[in-house]
UniProtKB/Swiss-Prot annotation:
Heterodimer of an acidic and a basic chain; non-covalently linked. The basic chain is toxic and has phospholipase A2 activity (chain HDP-1P (AC Q1RP79) or HDP-2P (AC Q1RP78)) and the acidic chain is non-toxic and functions as its inhibitor (chain HPD-1I). It comes from Vipera nikolskii (Nikolsky's adder). Heterodimer: slightly affects neuromuscular transmission acting presynaptically. It has a low catalytic activity, a low anticoagulant activity and weakly inhibits ADP-induced platelet aggregation. Monomer: has no activity (neurotoxic, catalytic, anticoagulant and a ADP-induced platelet aggregation), but inhibits phospholipase A2. One of its GO terms (cellular component) is extracellular region. InterPro entries: PLipase_A2, PLipase_A2_Asp_AS, PLipase_A2_dom, PLipase_A2_dom_sf. This is Acidic phospholipase A2 inhibitor chain HPD-1I. Belongs to the phospholipase A2 family. Group II subfamily. D49 sub-subfamily.
Amino acid sequence: MRTLWIVAVCLIGVEGNLFQFGDMILQKTGKEAVHSYAIYGCYCGWGGQGRAQDATDRCCFAQDCCYGRVNDCNPKTATYTYSFENGDIVCGDNDLCLRAVCECDRAAAICLGENVNTYDKNYEYYSISHCTEESEQC
């Protein structure tokens, strides 16, 4: 079981700060990030390719696009400050790079929350080998 946890942490932790983004996801969806989004569709989790499979997967695609726009800020490892105020995620960094990464994660968490009803268990642990359609443009 511990090995599975470590593998899941490595997979979802590839983009953004795992614990920070996971906390945002939990607040907005009520779902644990590692169990629900670490390997989902073509974009949630490790990398991404092909066409997003549903609205939930499109949230992760949009986050990948957002990270692409702030790549100089090291979005995969950035540690930023944020808080929850009246149910809202508030990014608090004065550092523009860290704030930009936080805003990418914030937008993705909000999107996942707004689309939690589209979550399809058929896309859990979805093989990237199925993600062969041409990708949309960011």
